[in-house]
Regions:
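Conserved HGGG/HGGXW glycine-rich cap/lid loop of the alpha/beta-hydrolase fold
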Residues: 44-99
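Hydrophobic, aromatic-rich cap/lid helix
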Residues: 189-216, 232
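Catalytic active-site module of serine/aspartate enzymes centered on a nucleophile-bearing elbow/loop
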Residues: 251-286
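Short beta-strand/loop motif that positions the catalytic acidic residue
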Residues: 221, 227-229
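Conserved hydrolase catalytic core segment
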Residues: 127-166
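N-terminal export signals
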Residues: 1-19
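Conserved alpha/beta-hydrolase "acid-adjacent" motif
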Residues: 234-240
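Active-site loop/oxyanion-hole signature of alpha/beta-hydrolase fold enzymes
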Residues: 49-52, 81, 90-132, 273
């Protein structure tokens, strides 16, 4: 069961340089088990996974996934089987997470992560993409869409914060993050991802999320936007989301029936169904 809200807050029924958006990359790519690594101008080394399950003679429209705090690009596993049949997926480990490295002088700011996302698209030869972000990655995605409107085909934000978040939320139990349906094995896996996050990254990201303020940027987002949250999110209430979402032109809100706040994982299949429909609708004129 789910319900959605249009821009004005009224209930609704939930539902490049080349043709594919590819540019020409001049960045050196190094193959890694399970993916590749590209070097960005900032000095960051970004590991990423590229997924395409469509016909080999076709080239799907690009989608850029931006994960949240205390995790890696692996968390999009529930999105890949269906999304990659229609889109070419780029799933980077954000700098400081997983197999991606930050340079010694890395600037821990939302603006720098936004620039990093743009530099990554340059490195893989993508001029524009559908941008999908979860949790802190959702905040990066919103700032990206406001900063690079010409590079944003559509925007999807799954449980992304619009304003500051207490860094202590990193100590929240996986049961709260993933919901009551999460298994012990699933929670143990996410504990492992959390524990693998370096103290430097935790401090840096903690400083970012404690100062998030997207209020003035939201009206600058011109891409069609889908905001996804849950009706019992411990991260932010539906009422909180409703104070911000209508400020994004051409946006809609989808509220899922769930007690998890990491809906991109806990409600992955439902998210994918709605995102596929949303992107299809966004391509329609009007």
């Amino acid at each position: 069961m789910k319900w959605g809200l249009a821009t004005a807050g009224l209930p609704i029924v939930a539902h490049s340089l080349t043709a594919s958006g590819e540019g020409i990359s001049t960045a050196a790519k190094n193959s890694e088990p399970g993916g590749s690594i590209v070097a960005l101008p900032s000095g960051a080394q970004v590991f990423y996974r590229e997924d395409w399950l469509g016909a080999p003679w076709l080239d799907g429209e690009p989608v850029l996934f931006l994960h949240g705090n205390l995790e890696t690009s692996e968390v999009w596993y529930g999105w890949v089987p269906r999304m990659a049949q229609r889109f070419r997926l780029y799933r980077p480990d954000l700098p400081g997470f997983g197999r991606s490295k930050v340079p010694a002088n890395f600037e821990w700011s939302l603006a720098n992560y936004t620039k990093t996302a743009a530099d990554f698209l340059d490195a893989v030869g993508v001029a524009s993409a559908h941008i999908i972000g979860a949790k802190t990655g959702g905040a990066i995605a919103m700032q990206f869409a406001a900063t690079y409107p010409q590079r944003t085909r559509t925007l999807v934000v799954a449980s992304g914060p619009f304003s500051s978040v207490d860094p202590k939320t990193e100590n929240t139990s996986q049961q709260v993050r993933l919901g009551s349906a999460a298994t012990k094995e699933e929670m143990a896996y996410f504990d492992k991802l959390r524990d693998a996050t370096s103290p430097e990254t935790r401090r840096g990201i903690g400083g970012i999320i404690s100062t998030i303020n997207l209020d003035n940027l939201l009206p600058k987002i011109t891409a069609r936007t889908l905001i996804i949250t849950s009706d019992r999110s411990a991260l932010q209430s539906v009422e909180t989301v409703l104070r911000y979402q209508p400020k994004i032109p051409n946006s809609r809100l989808l509220v899922l029936t769930s007690d998890a706040y990491h809906v991109a994982v806990a409600n992955a299949d439902e998210c994918v169904t709605n995102v596929l429909g949303f992107i299809q609708d966004a391509k329609m004129p009007g």
